[in-house]
Amino acid sequence: NKEEKYRELLPQLHALVSTETDLIANLANVAAALKQTFGFFWVGFYLVKEDELVLGPFQGPIACTRIRFGRGVCGTAWKEARTLIVPDVEQFPGHIACSSDSKSEIVVPILQQGEVVGVLDIDSNELDSFDTIDARYLEEICTYIG
């Protein structure tokens, strides 16, 4: 059960990141934990640098390194400062295809003092892989980082 996996993972991640002050180390461990627990196709972070998102720690195939504000799923989640669940990436206007194997996606903004400082991006190689359960728990995980 997906929700049980999240419930087990959350306290572990909270303990892990609350004792480490280095952002990159925390992002790397969160990406690894999510990939290991759920077997997602791609899990990673993009960090805001001026008018672009720049690739941070990730688990999975080689990824796009820069995404402009408002472009694709990640750039749109940044612009709108909200979680986006995309059941079929082919149907998302302006989707940036880093990998043709990516079929569905969820992007969760990381906020500091109300400003988006990065996003958590998770891709699945199956359609319709993400729902409000994922959104709720991934948003909580992102509060540990922000």
Label each PLM-derived region with a short phrase.
Residues 104-111:
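A short, aliphatic-rich beta-strand micro-motif
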Residues 42, 107, 119:
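Short hydrophobic/aromatic beta-strand element in the GNAT-like acyltransferase core
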Residues 111-124:
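Sensory-domain boundary capping and coupling elements
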Residues 1-57, 144:
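Intrinsically disordered, low-complexity terminal regulatory regions
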Residues 89-90, 123-125:
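Anionic group-transfer/hydrolysis microenvironments
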Residues 10-14, 124-146:
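Juxtadomain coupling helices with adjacent low-complexity linkers
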